[in-house]
């Protein structure tokens, strides 16, 4: 039985620390993956840059003026009364509104899509470089076009149920075409230039094709979207923004693959935007004209009355010259009274459009209150003048105030008539949309390098993901830190052993033992260090039976077993090496021996020990092969005969070394390890994971077996140039395909 040694406590994993060296290791180890992904993404970017349909941008620029007329009048600035005082955000929303966009949709029939049917990905690119009509189809099939084919559809109306569904229009030749859709009762035929109307069970189809340039067999794609959906799509595509904060300049642009149509859409939007502004101002002016028309006769009558009273006074009292104080008072009084009357007139006009709670009306009320206070003050000052001068000032003031109001009102009405006639607006088109000549995207000189950068980023991400999911341990220190087990030896990868492994798979007889071929190989030197470590470890072991196992196949366990046995034997020990992997064992190939007879024959009692043991395969080393692969290896290992054999071997040799199957593949190892004095776990650089090692230890502990140490095999210093790297993975249950009926695997190398 294995001595139950206390398990060293697992050292807690370090915190997530920035280890630049290990990160560089991951990048170097996955350099070809990164390069491959970067190249693939760059090729995709280049393909997009050269094959994607060019996108053009058409733009307009409009100016929103605060006040198109600087003339002063009765109402302050009459045009400002009818200007829609809105900020840039409000104007942007008006420009994007369905009221404006809808006109462009209707005038240009944007809800109708009619285009040639191109072959996916490359068809449009080839067509854009063609100079003549093409022969339709791909190998005569499909109706794809490759040339300068075109279609002009002036009208296309379908039942609501068919809106958004694709139709196919096939050219028949001689000016005829056929319209197809799966929802139609039957294909519909029509003539170019003539209206088509066809009644179907789902509704009436109306189509007007004005022009069709293509050879017979060419196919075009037609689609009729709803007007609302088309407007919403156009609204989403519009890019509108103010050019500079509070500049009053608004820019709008639209992207599209058809440069002429894109420019036409923007010009339609600009025209309608300016027109709606003028129309709204004209409507406001009409309401104000009605108000002023009613006010003008009243002002004229008041002016005539004031003049009559003034003339009567002059006739009665004669001419009277005002003093300097009276003249100054008269001028000031006229100014204040005129301002008050203008404010009252302005308030009355605003009330025709707004309520008394409107901010504009309330602001006027505050000004009227202030101005009324000034008038009252002027009235009190007037009483300080002589009586005759008071009467003269009062009458002259009334005449001048009424005259200024009347003249100003006439000027206002003239301006309003201009506004009503649509000749004045506070919005003007600064720049109309020109047909763009150069596409804005894809930017070929930008897309490809950016795709390369993106590819590198994705490659780096893939490298770290791959390392996290599938990367194995690259630093033996990780094993010690995360499992508490000691790493007895780190065996470097041997190029010579790689060659020997290739020869081993040829099944040619010979000895392929690295310890005999190249005894000074670094891998063998590492195994000599392991031999020294074992000498000290065996002092605490319960017996001289050592079991070597691994978590999974392919870790180099057989290589370590064979060469370690040879190294110990050359040190003067009597060693027996047993290949107990009765499912895939192939240690006999290292020594140029046959598989049978072997351990199976001993357990079955068919052969004696002398008949099975291969003596002196290496001086001081005897060897027992597996024998033929049985169907029930686990049951055979549980045979009491196995206990007797192990006791016999332990008494005859200084050390008995047993090579067993992988722990996570089969249960055989736990049976043998339970009787061993020492169990060593062989792991492999970049293949074994911490999760697999932990699971191996766990399964052996369930069988009352403690793993004493670890051999870290096949370290490749050329893989990681900056350090060992790191792997913090979880054990993954996978199907190893490790069965007794499988063929022996290829030889493992250090």
From Swiss-Prot:
One Gene Ontology term of the biological-process aspect is: polysaccharide biosynthetic process
Coarsely, its chief localization is: membrane
Report the transmembrane regions from the record. Answer: 32-52, 445-465
Give me the Periplasmic side stretches, as residue ranges: 53-444
Query: What reactions does this protein catalyze?
Result: L-tyrosyl-[protein] + ATP = O-phospho-L-tyrosyl-[protein] + ADP + H(+)
* Residue intervals on the Cytoplasmic side: 1-31, 466-750
The alphabetized UniProt keywords are:
ATP-binding, Cell inner membrane, Cell membrane, Exopolysaccharide synthesis, Kinase, Membrane, Nucleotide-binding, Plasmid, Transferase, Transmembrane, Transmembrane helix, Tyrosine-protein kinase, Virulence
Q: What's a Pfam family this protein contains?
A: GNVR
- List, alphabetically, the SUPFAM superfamilies matched: P-loop containing nucleoside triphosphate hydrolases (SSF52540)
Q: Report the sequence similarity comment from the record.
A: Belongs to the etk/wzc family.
What protein name is recorded for this chain?
Answer: Putative tyrosine-protein kinase EpsB
């Amino acid at each position: 039985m294995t001595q139950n040694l206390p398990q060293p406590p697992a050292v807690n994993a370090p915190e997530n620390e920035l280890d630049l060296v290990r990160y560089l290791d991951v990048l170097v180890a996955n350099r070809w993956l990164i390069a491959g992904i970067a190249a693939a993404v760059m090729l995709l970017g280049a393909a997009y840059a050269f094959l994607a349909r060019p996108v053009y941008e058409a733009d307009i620029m409009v100016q929103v003026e605060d006040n198109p007329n600087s003339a002063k009048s009765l109402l302050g600035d009459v045009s400002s009364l009818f200007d829609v005082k809105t900020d840039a955000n409000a104007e942007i929303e008006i420009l994007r509104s369905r009221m404006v966009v809808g006109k462009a949709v209707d005038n240009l029939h944007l809800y109708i899509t009619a285009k040639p049917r191109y072959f996916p990905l490359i068809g449009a690119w080839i067509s854009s470089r063609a100079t003549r009509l093409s022969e339709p189809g791909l190998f005569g099939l499909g109706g794809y076009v490759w040339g300068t084919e075109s279609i002009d559809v002036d009208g296309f109306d379908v039942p609501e149920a068919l809106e958004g569904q694709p139709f196919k229009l096939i050219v028949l030749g001689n000016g005829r075409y056929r319209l197809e859709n799966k929802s139609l009762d039957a294909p519909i035929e029509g003539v170019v230039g003539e209206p088509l109307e066809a009644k179907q069970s789902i509704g009436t189809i109306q189509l007007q094709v004005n022009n069709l340039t293509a050879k017979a067999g060419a196919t075009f794609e037609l689609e009729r979207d709803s007007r609302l959906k088309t407007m919403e799509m156009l609204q989403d595509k519009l890019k509108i923004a103010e050019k500079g904060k509070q500049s009053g300049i608004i820019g709008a642009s639209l992207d599209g693959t058809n440069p002429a149509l894109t420019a036409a859409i923007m010009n339609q939007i600009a025209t309608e935007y300016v027109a709606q502004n003028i129309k709204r101002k004209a409507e406001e002016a009409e309401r104000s004209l009605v108000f002023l028309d009613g006010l003008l006769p009243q002002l004229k009558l008041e002016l005539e009355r004031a003049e009559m009273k003034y003339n009567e006074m002059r006739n009665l009292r004669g001419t009277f010259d005002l003093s300097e104080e009276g003249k100054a008072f008269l001028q000031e009084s006229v100014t204040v009274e005129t301002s008050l009357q203008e404010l009252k007139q302005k308030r009355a006009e605003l009330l025709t459009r707004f309520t008394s709670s409107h901010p504009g009306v309330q602001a006027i009320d505050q000004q009227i209150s202030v101005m009324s206070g000034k008038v009252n003050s002027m009235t009190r000052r007037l009483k300080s003048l002589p009586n005759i001068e008071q009467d003269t000032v009062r009458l002259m003031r009334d005449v001048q105030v009424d005259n200024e109001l009347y003249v100003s009102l006439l000027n206002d009405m003239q301006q309003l008539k201009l506004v009503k006639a649509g000749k004045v607006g506070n919005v003007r088109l600064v720049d109309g949309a020109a047909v763009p000549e150069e596409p804005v995207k894809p930017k070929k000189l930008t897309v490809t390098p950016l795709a390369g950068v993106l590819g590198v980023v994705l490659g780096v991400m893939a490298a770290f993901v791959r390392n996290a999911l599938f990367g194995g341990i690259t630093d033996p220190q990780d094993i010690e830190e995360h499992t508490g087990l000691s790493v007895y030896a780190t065996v470097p990868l041997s190029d010579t052993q790689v060659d020997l492994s290739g020869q081993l798979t040829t099944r040619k007889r010979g000895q392929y033992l690295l310890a005999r071929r190249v005894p000074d190989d670094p891998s063998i030197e590492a195994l000599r260090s392991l031999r020294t470590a074992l000498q000290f470890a065996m002092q605490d072991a319960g017996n001289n039976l050592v079991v070597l196992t691994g978590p999974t196949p392919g870790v180099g366990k057989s290589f370590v077993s064979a060469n370690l046995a040879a190294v110990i034997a050359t040190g003067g020990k009597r060693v027996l090496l047993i290949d107990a992997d009765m499912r895939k064992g192939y240690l006999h190939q290292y020594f140029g021996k046959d598989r049978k007879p072997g351990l199976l024959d001993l357990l079955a009692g068919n052969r004696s020990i002398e008949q099975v043991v291969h003596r002196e395969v290496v001086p001081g080393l005897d060897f027992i092969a597996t024998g033929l692969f049985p169907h029930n290896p686990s049951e055979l290992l549980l045979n009491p005969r196995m206990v007797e054999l192990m006791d016999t071997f332990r008494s005859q040799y200084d050390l008995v070394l047993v090579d067993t199957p992988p722990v996570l593949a089969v249960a055989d190892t736990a049976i043998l390890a339970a009787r061993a004095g020492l169990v060593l776990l062989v792991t492999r650089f970049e293949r074994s994971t911490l999760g697999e090692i932990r699971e191996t230890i766990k399964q052996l502990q369930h069988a009352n077996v403690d793993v004493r140490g670890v051999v870290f095999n096949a370290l490749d210093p050329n893989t990681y140039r900056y350090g060992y790297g790191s792997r913090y993975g979880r054990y993954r249950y996978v199907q190893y395909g490790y069965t007794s009926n499988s063929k022996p695997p290829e030889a493992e190398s250090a």
